[in-house]
Amino acid sequence: MMDKESPQFKMLKLTLANLDWEDEGEAWDDSAFLPLPDRESLTDSEREDLDWVVARDRRKFANMPMVRDRFDFRVAPLFGALLQSPRLARLWAESGDFFITAKARGTMNEMDRAWLDMALVPLLVNGWVQSGNIAVAGGLGITAEAIEAIRQDRLDVLAPEARKLVDLAQAVARGTLGADQFKALASEYGTKWVVEAIGYVVFRIGSAIIDSVLWQVQGIEGGPHIVDEMITALAEGRLGQQNMFDKEGFARDRLKSS
């Protein structure tokens, strides 16, 4: 059963703001959402990219159990904006798919990515990105106490394995990852793993910025308060089993479509 007051549901109202939320008391200005470009204005390759991204967004929607059976599919506002440049939209989507399928390729697993994401909670500019990652991390067993410790820079309380991943992500974000730290990580995880982890952190930071900007230009304001709501809900055991986005299901679908 969908809890309409849950932080997950509030986030979906932002992520998919162009769905018909009228019965939920939300009133978004439809005129602010960027329409998909006129196909006749695109080159053949741009039309191919547009179709690829729309099909990918449809697969993603099909893996959102809280909304897929209630609403008709629409391209989410983020990709509605990115698709003004179809090639950019496809490159961005393919980058995300590359990281979400990392486990199948033998590099980062879901828990690895979750700790890298939690390391960025105090550093990102977009509350929505942080909150979504917190919901995923909580589902994997990362506690609210651990997330708060990262927010408060009390990294010494983290388990050694988690601390290594948090230190890596924050060093990348701050531009301080040096040769010694890189070599130590590479000797434990493998050079390919570390390079992909660096790429993932950079992608996450970029995603937080571009998501925030492309939402704002379409009149969607999330605000940082949802981060505190999500952590409180996790601490109080209120997140439950509500899954905003079945990442593993999407990853399987993505690999099948390759």
Labelled PLM ranges:
Residues 113-135, 147, 201-204, 208:
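Short, thiol/selenol-centered motifs that function as redox-active sites or metal-ligating centers
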Residues 191-242:
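Preference for long, well-ordered alpha-helical segments
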Residues 1-112, 223-258:
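Secretory/endomembrane lumenal or extracellular ectodomains immediately following the signal peptide
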Residues 98-99, 121-125, 155-157, 175, ...:
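A short structural micro-motif
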